[in-house]
């Protein structure tokens, strides 16, 4: 190989390496995209939403890095999340990505009574909205809707069917341990979250497992959209859900 061609190849490889390094640094330190695979956060997030998650609000842990290599423990520049934040975290048992709403911080006492969320013995204020038909695996069902307002200033809409599952609508008091957090889905009847032990739900989530805070729904498609059917990229696009701040 001529010297000039060899130098050109080396420079090209250097440029590629720099580009990859910049991409990885951006993904680890700043922002990362996620897709929503389940209905557990409806109506806030729906299957097919493409969400942008910021990686820096709570500092960084090994779970900020792809494949969660055991390079260090704990968090670097740790900052506390707020109740009401929508957060991506690693499941404490199997390490899969989860997205739920934070309602309990260390020391909090969390409980559900007749479907009402209580934090430290105080009922979270909520306003009833008109019921909404929701498509589920059991067909279209009518869900109650409520606006919950946390003391952090966050408000959001939840789905609820208090007549369906007494186990999730009437719980024991959960005392959140130090260094852990308590998460629930906005779709209270279809979310395996901190109300359930890790074998079925997620239990208490260690601070180290937090990945980042969901900021935007960037783009969104209906469930019928398919990578292998290009026309559905347009026919199933949900423009009304795109570019939405969370």
Language model region names:
Residues 2-10, 29-35, 40-246:
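Soluble "head" domains of membrane/secretory-pathway proteins
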Residues 14-29:
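Hydrophobic membrane-insertion alpha-helices, especially the h-region
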């Amino acid at each position: 190989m001529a010297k000039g061609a060899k130098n050109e190849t080396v420079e090209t490889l250097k440029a590629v390496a720099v580009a990859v390094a910049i991409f990885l640094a951006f993904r680890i330190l700043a922002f990362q995209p996620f897709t929503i695979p389940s209905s557990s956060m409806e109506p806030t997030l729906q299957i097919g939403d493409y969400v942008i998650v910021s990686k820096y609000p709570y500092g960084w842990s090994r779970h900020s890095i792809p494949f969660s290599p055991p390079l260090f423990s704990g968090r670097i520049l740790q900052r506390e999340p707020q109740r009401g934040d929508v957060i991506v975290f690693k499941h404490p048992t199997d390490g899969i990505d989860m997205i739920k709403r934070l309602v309990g911080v260390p020391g909090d006492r969390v409980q559900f009574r007749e479907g009402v969320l209580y934090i430290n013995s105080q009922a979270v204020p909520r306003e009833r909205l008109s019921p909404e038909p929701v498509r589920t695996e059991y067909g279209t069902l009518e869900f109650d809707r409520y606006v919950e307002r946390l003391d952090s200033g966050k408000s959001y809409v939840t789905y609820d069917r208090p007549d369906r599952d007494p186990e999730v609508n009437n719980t024991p008091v959960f005392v959140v341990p130090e260094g852990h957090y308590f998460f629930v889905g906005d779709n209270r009847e279809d979310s395996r979250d901190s109300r359930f032990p890790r074998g079925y739900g997620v239990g208490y989530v260690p601070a180290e497992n937090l990945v980042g805070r969901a900021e935007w729904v960037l783009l969104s498609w209906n469930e019928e959209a398919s990578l292998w059917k290009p026309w559905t990229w347009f026919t199933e696009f949900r423009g009304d859900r795109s570019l939405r701040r969370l």
